């Protein structure tokens, strides 16, 4: 590289480093862009002189560089333009110029060609046309640059351009769905991200309007408030993106888990642990994109309407204050929301009641939103407003859209201060994927879908139950309040009771309705906890659950709320196995509450009699049956449900000395039930778990039982890896049975290290602290309940079983609750040694070391 270029490159590096250092001191986004852009232009000037001095070509900044928005690791978008088609010699010159840019590590993105060629290239290329919309002359022949801009502007169909940009935005938003996009969002392309702000300004510029916010205020396009909010949202997002590039040292626009703590710390979120820093950063991010979405929803249709051909307007009178324009509602006088604030809710009420109205007319929306910022205590205390707000839930129609609309524009947070505290609050607990406010509204949506015939095919039984439930509005409110106390510290279910009762008192609910609402908020985790963590075959578990529930109405409401909550937490959590757990508990509790629970001994006897009846119908002699029951022992009927007993008995009654393996595909699910019967021996349970994990199965539940003649009868429910289609299940079943049969007959089976499979990036960088509790069972001496919470990973259950074995603890039952990347496992174990506090402490320490 020539000496003059080496000097220019060194100057550039110094200016770039100075710009970054200055930014880290001041956090002024606009100053960084100006200084960094100037540094790049200084280097480009030297390179241009070296390659194209006295040329008819010109160099233009396009795209992000053109608008002066250059991030630390962004591409430098350029265009080399010629008044005439490029000759071979000029093309070679341009190639050398581009290579020099790469040598300088500028990451160039360069378009080149003659004026006509470039105009033709972007005619049907919306991305290229957009890049040149922001073209800015740098060096060379200015006349060439002016001619290119003139021709491109002349050929651009503004209405078609705007339509294409809006379609592009829809597609971009559609790609930003799913858990990954929520947890590790792309700050540039997500809904409400930087690209949405750019789109708004492109639509304005294509119409010949200004592209800076103060000028748009002067032109009457934006109000000062709107410009201020949009500017604030933009600065927040740009601030995060600059820090993201600086920490990643690459053009990374996703807020990846491993980068979130680094970005948060460099932005000044100090004095907090890494998880809290990340949560605070993400909350700032979600609030910023919410502001952008608010303004985009108002300004985009307004800007579009300036140039789009107006369709036939169908105007209908609604009442003295409102008219319907096509599918939108418009206020006759937009100052009505300031003069009569009760209309803030009234217009929403009308929109909810009318299926033919889907939106507020843009000018009406703008005025309505401006008035919502006046919502205060006086507005809340107005009984008309309270009646209308409660009416949104009583009506039910369009409830989800109504609440999401009110949340998007900040009305829920202004009306209910408790709601404002959860807006954008993300939980790094390895299974929630939505901010708390989005999660709550998704749960409301799920409850509402159960009430609609059109969605009955999704969950037929739950839908029928919901559609016969008398007080659906209380269920909607329970969904709305169930997590409203998140983020305050302490038990959010208990803290939420006060919010729910205050709302009920203020919004004219009866005492009975208030009691049901408060009970559901307090106990919204009860059913999922019992179903997923406890052994509902144990009569004492069912008895304790029903004492909490007390009535069939509460049971039905809790069942419906629990289903909706799990489905609204993370799409990965809802599966046929969880559905069956909840349904089993629901029906068992229903029978109990109806007086059919019976005493435990009668229940166990009934289970044995059902199995005996089955064997008698199969012509099994009574003498043979008694031999089987004696081998299994009386405790067997206390620890297994009827369906398992019937299955075991049919397979064991003729021979309960020979080891066997049996499996069956559970109906309407992606799971197998597997039974293993063989002589007892060391580490058998752990080794069986390793076989399942080696095949990629998730163990959902496991029951370890030792017969009177010292055989193990272990029963597992395992989930088939998601990449397999149902038609593959029989082959998978055969392969699994073959390996298990080899194992029970003494053949060596290869064991794989617990750490041979990696855990996810989220689990690595946002781990949860493992916790362990060991509690003695009240009615069973030497029996203990062990509760473990940890990051989920392959071989977790096998490793726990190994530690139990090493500490002379006999594992008898395991209930595995896998919540995406979080494991909440419950074990029932037998060990007289655990009476000794030192041994119990040693066990706990060993488990913690394995989970760390």
From Swiss-Prot:
Record domain HD: where: 436-558
SMART domains per record: HDc (SM00471)
Keyword Hydrolase included in the entry's annotation: yes
Domain of life: Bacteria
Entry keywords, A to Z: Hydrolase, Magnesium, Multifunctional enzyme, Nucleotidyltransferase, Repeat, Transferase
InterPro entries: ACT-like_dom_sf (IPR045865), ACT_dom (IPR002912), HD/PDEase_dom (IPR003607), HD_domain (IPR006674), NT_sf (IPR043519), PII_UdlTrfase/GS_AdlTrfase (IPR013546), UTase/UR (IPR010043)
CDD domains tied to this protein: ACT_ACR-UUR-like_2 (cd04899), ACT_UUR-like_1 (cd04900), HDc (cd00077), NT_GlnE_GlnD_like (cd05401)
SUPFAM superfamilies: ACT-like (SSF55021), HD-domain/PDEase-like (SSF109604), Nucleotidyltransferase (SSF81301), Nucleotidyltransferase substrate binding subunit/domain (SSF81593)
Free-text domain note: Has four distinct domains: an N-terminal nucleotidyltransferase (NT) domain responsible for UTase activity, a central HD domain that encodes UR activity, and two C-terminal ACT domains that seem to have a role in glutamine sensing.
The protein's required cofactors: Mg(2+)
Species of provenance: Neisseria meningitidis serogroup C / serotype 2a (strain ATCC 700532 / DSM 15464 / FAM18)
Family of the protein in this entry: Belongs to the GlnD family.
EC number: 2.7.7.59, 3.1.4.-
Gene: glnD
PROSITE patterns named among the record's database cross-references: ACT, HD
Claim: Nucleotidyltransferase is one of the keywords in the record: yes
Span list, region Uridylyltransferase: 1-318
HAMAP family: PII_uridylyl_transf
Activity regulation info: Uridylyltransferase (UTase) activity is inhibited by glutamine, while glutamine activates uridylyl-removing (UR) activity.
Role description: Modifies, by uridylylation and deuridylylation, the PII regulatory proteins (GlnB and homologs), in response to the nitrogen status of the cell that GlnD senses through the glutamine level. Under low glutamine levels, catalyzes the conversion of the PII proteins and UTP to PII-UMP and PPi, while under higher glutamine levels, GlnD hydrolyzes PII-UMP to PII and UMP (deuridylylation). Thus, controls uridylylation state and activity of the PII proteins, and plays an important role in the regulation of nitrogen assimilation and metabolism.
Residues covered by region (Uridylyl-removing): 319-672
Pfam families membership: GlnD_UR_UTase, HD
Catalyzed reaction equations: [protein-PII]-L-tyrosine + UTP = [protein-PII]-uridylyl-L-tyrosine + diphosphate; [protein-PII]-uridylyl-L-tyrosine + H2O = [protein-PII]-L-tyrosine + UMP + H(+)
PANTHER family assigned: BIFUNCTIONAL URIDYLYLTRANSFERASE/URIDYLYL-REMOVING ENZYME, BIFUNCTIONAL URIDYLYLTRANSFERASE_URIDYLYL-REMOVING ENZYME
One BP annotation, GO: regulation of nitrogen utilization
GO MF, any single term: [protein-PII] uridylyltransferase activity
Protein name: Bifunctional uridylyltransferase/uridylyl-removing enzyme
């Amino acid at each position: 590289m020539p000496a003059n270029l080496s000097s220019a490159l060194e100057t550039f590096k110094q200016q770039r480093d100075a710009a970054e250092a200055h930014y880290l001191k001041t956090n002024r986004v606009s100053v960084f862009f100006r200084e960094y852009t100037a540094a790049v232009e200084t280097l480009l000037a030297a390179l241009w002189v070296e390659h194209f001095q006295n040329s008819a070509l010109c160099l233009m900044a396009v795209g992000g560089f053109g608008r002066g928005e250059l991030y630390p690791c962004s591409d430098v978008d350029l265009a080399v333009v010629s008044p005439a088609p490029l000759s071979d010699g000029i093309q070679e010159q341009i190639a050398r110029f581009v290579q020099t840019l790469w040598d300088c590590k500028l990451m160039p993105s360069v378009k080149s060609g003659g004026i006509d060629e470039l105009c033709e290239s972007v005619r049907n290329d919306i991305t290229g046309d957009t890049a040149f919309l922001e073209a800015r002359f740098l060096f060379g022949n200015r006349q060439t640059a002016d001619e290119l801009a003139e021709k491109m502007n002349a050929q651009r169909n503004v209405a078609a351009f705007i339509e294409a940009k809006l379609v592009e935005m829809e597609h971009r938003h559609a790609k930003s769905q799913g858990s990954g996009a929520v947890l590790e969002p792309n700050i540039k392309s997500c809904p409400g991200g930087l690209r949405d702000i750019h789109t708004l300004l492109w639509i304005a510029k294509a119409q010949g309007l200004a592209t800076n916010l103060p000028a748009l205020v002067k032109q009457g396009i934006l109000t000062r408030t709107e410009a201020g909010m949009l500017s604030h949202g933009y600065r927040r997002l740009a601030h995060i993106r600059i820090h993201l590039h600086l920490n990643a040292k690459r053009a990374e626009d996703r807020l990846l888990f491993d980068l979130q703590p680094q970005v948060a710390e460099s932005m000044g979120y100090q004095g907090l642990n890494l998880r809290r820093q990340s949560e605070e950063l993400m909350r700032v991010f979600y609030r910023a994109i919410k502001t952008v979405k608010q303004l985009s929803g108002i300004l985009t249709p307004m800007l579009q309407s300036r140039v789009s051909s107006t369709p036939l307007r169908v105007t209908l009178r609604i009442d003295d204050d409102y008219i319907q324009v096509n599918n939108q509602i418009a206020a006759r006088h937009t100052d009505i929301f300031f003069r009569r604030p009760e209309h803030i809710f009234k217009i929403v009420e009308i929109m909810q009641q009318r299926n033919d109205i889907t939106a507020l007319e843009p000018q009406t929306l703008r005025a309505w939103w401006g008035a919502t910022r006046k919502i205060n205590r006086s507005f809340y205390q107005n009984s008309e407003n309270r009646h209308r707000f409660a009416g949104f839930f009583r009506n039910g129609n369009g409830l989800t859209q109504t609440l999401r609309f009110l949340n998007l524009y900040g009305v829920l947070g202004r009306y209910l201060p408790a709601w404002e505290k959860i807006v954008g609050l993300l939980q790094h607990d390895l299974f929630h994927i939505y901010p708390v406010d989005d999660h709550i509204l998704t749960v409301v949506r799920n409850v509402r879908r159960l009430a609609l015939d059109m969605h009955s095919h999704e969950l037929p039984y739950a839908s029928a139950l919901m559609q016969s439930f008398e007080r659906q509005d209380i269920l909607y409110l329970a969904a709305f309040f169930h997590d409203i106390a998140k983020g305050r510290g302490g038990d959010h279910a208990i803290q939420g009771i006060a919010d729910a009762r205050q709302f009920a008192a203020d919004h004219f609910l009866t005492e009975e309705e208030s009691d049901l609402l408060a009970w559901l908020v307090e106990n919204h985790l009860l059913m999922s906890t019992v179903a997923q963590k406890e052994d509902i075959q144990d009569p004492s578990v069912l008895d304790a659950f029903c004492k909490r529930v007390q009535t069939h109405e509460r049971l039905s409401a809790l069942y419906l709320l629990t289903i909706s909550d799990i489905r609204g937490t993370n799409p990965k959590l809802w599966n046929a196995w969880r559905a069956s757990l909840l349904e089993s508990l629901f029906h068992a509790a229903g029978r109990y509450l109806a007086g059919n629970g019976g005493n435990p001994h009668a229940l166990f006897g009934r289970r044995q009699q059902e199995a005996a009846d089955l064997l008698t119908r199969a012509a099994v002699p009574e003498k043979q049956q008694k031999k089987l029951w004696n081998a299994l022992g009386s405790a067997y009927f206390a620890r297994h449900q009827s369906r398992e007993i019937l299955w075991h008995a049919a397979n064991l009654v003729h021979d309960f000395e020979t080891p066997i393996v049996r499996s069956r595909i559970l109906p309407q699910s992606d799971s197998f039930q597997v039974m293993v019967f063989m002589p007892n021996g060391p580490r058998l349970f752990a080794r069986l778990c390793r076989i399942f994990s080696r095949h990629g199965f998730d163990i959902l539940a496991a029951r370890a039982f030792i017969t009177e003649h010292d055989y193990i009868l272990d029963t597992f429910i395992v989930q088939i890896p998601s990449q397999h289609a149902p038609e593959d299940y029989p082959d998978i079943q055969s392969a699994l049975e073959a390996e298990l049969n080899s194992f029970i007959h003494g053949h060596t089976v290869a064991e794989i290290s617990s750490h041979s499979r990696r855990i996810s990036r989220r689990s690595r960088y946002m781990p949860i602290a493992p916790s362990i509790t060991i509690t003695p069972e009240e009615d069973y001496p030497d029996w203990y309940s062990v509760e473990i919470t940890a990051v989920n990973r392959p071989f977790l259950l096998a490793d726990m079983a190994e530690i139990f074995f090493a500490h002379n603890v006999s594992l008898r039952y395991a209930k595995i609750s896998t919540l995406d990347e979080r494991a909440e496992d419950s074990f029932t174990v037998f060990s007289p040694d655990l009476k000794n506090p030192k041994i119990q402490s040693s066990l706990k320490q060993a488990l913690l070391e394995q989970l760390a």
